[in-house]
Amino acid sequence: WASQVSENRPVCKAIIQGKQFEGLVDTGADVSIIALNQWPKNWPKQKAVTGLVGIGTASEVYQSTEILHCLGPDNQESTVQPMITSIPLNLWGRDLLQQWGAEITMPAPLYSPTSQKIMTKMGYIPGKGLGKNEDGIKIPFEAKINQKREGIGYPF
């Protein structure tokens, strides 16, 4: 599973004890939280001994009495003892994300900051092609060495 940061929230599915849930990937949450209205009535829960900070004021906070088996979005095996409260959507916290091997990466730019500034001053808009109608090549291509040892591409 992969998601590029955009205006859309990073949401993925997980299967807990055989039941599918959808939740928001939340790297700022220490623990995973299941929305009270999605918690199966026959699954045991208990009043939580600790409150939840950072999600506003939650009057009823519960925790699963059991450690539950979970499959991540790419069938990663994990376990979770989620908190349960009245929130609009489930949150997958670092307790699960770490077990799933989640990573946050910021790839290095393809071009130097100087070349990016020059291109921007020339009217280049990221994601658009070059040319009058902005329909030219949108991704860079790699120069290949000419193996015939003649013409452009031959290393001198």
From Swiss-Prot:
InterPro entries: Aspartic_peptidase_AS, G_patch_dom, HERV-K_Pro_peptidase_A2, Peptidase_A2_cat, Peptidase_aspartic_dom_sf, Retropepsin-like_cat_dom, Retropepsins. Its EC number is 3.4.23.50. The keyword Protease applies. Autoproteolytically processed at the N-terminus. Expected C-terminal autoprocessing not detected. The sequence shown is that of the processed Pro protein. It catalyses: Processing at the authentic HIV-1 PR recognition site and release of the mature p17 matrix and the p24 capsid protein, as a result of the cleavage of the -SQNY-|-PIVQ- cleavage site. PROSITE patterns: ASP_PROT_RETROV, ASP_PROTEASE, G_PATCH. Residues 21-96 form the Peptidase A2 domain. It is an enzyme of class 3 (hydrolase). GO terms for biological process: proteolysis; viral translational frameshifting. GO terms for molecular function: aspartic-type endopeptidase activity; nucleic acid binding. The active site is at D26. Pfam families: G-patch, RVP. Residues 111-156 form the G-patch domain. Keywords: Aspartyl protease, Autocatalytic cleavage, ERV, Hydrolase, Protease, Transposable element. Active as a homodimer. Retroviral proteases have roles in processing of the primary translation products and the maturation of the viral particle. Endogenous Pro proteins may have kept, lost or modified their original function during evolution. This endogenous protein has retained most of the characteristics of retroviral proteases. Belongs to the peptidase A2 family. HERV class-II K(HML-2) subfamily. This is Endogenous retrovirus group K member 24 Pro protein.
